[in-house]
Amino acid sequence: MKIPRLTVVTLGVADLQRATDFYAQVLGTPPDTSNEGVTFIRLPGTWLSLFPLEHLAHDISTKVTPQRGAFSGFTLAHNARSKEDVTAIIERARSAGARVWKEPQEAFWGGFHAYFSDPDGYYWEVVWGPMFEFTPDGALKFTEAS
């Protein structure tokens, strides 16, 4: 069976209300639903789910490892439509309480990007690149760089 797309990204969070408020401000959209201890935010083509970390670990049948804040080799990314959008999103994240690790700047590969982490330590790249385009429904499409 082929998996056609990633449908939900779930982040285990220490404080559900804080995380819900943070992402509503950064993403500029209210949660679609927030009840029974989980928040769902609809994004084009996928959902962002926020779930209390201890409950998520219990649901998986594992334990929480106390390494929050250390870089684990995992990032999430948002592809912006312009360099200006990268800067605006980073400023929105900063004002919502994010820690900015890399200010908006030119990337070695010809794009423009920045990095921040949310209050739970998840790292995000906000990026624009000349090889990124969007379909009418907002899906990312890679093209030849000029």
Where are these regions (language model features)?
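Short, hinge-like loop/turn segments at secondary-structure boundaries
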Residues: 49-50, 66-67, 120
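Vicinal oxygen chelate
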Residues: 2, 5-14, 39-42, 63-146
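Short loop/turn positions at the edges of beta-strands in beta-sheet-rich folds
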Residues: 33-35, 80, 108, 120
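Alpha-helical elements of the RecA-like P-loop NTPase motor core of helicases
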Residues: 20-21, 58, 87, 102, ...
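N-terminal beta-strand motif that seeds the catalytic metal site of vicinal oxygen chelate
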Residues: 1-20, 73-78, 130-146
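A short, acidic/glycine-rich surface segment
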Residues: 57-63, 133-136
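Core segments of cupin and vicinal oxygen chelate
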Residues: 10-57
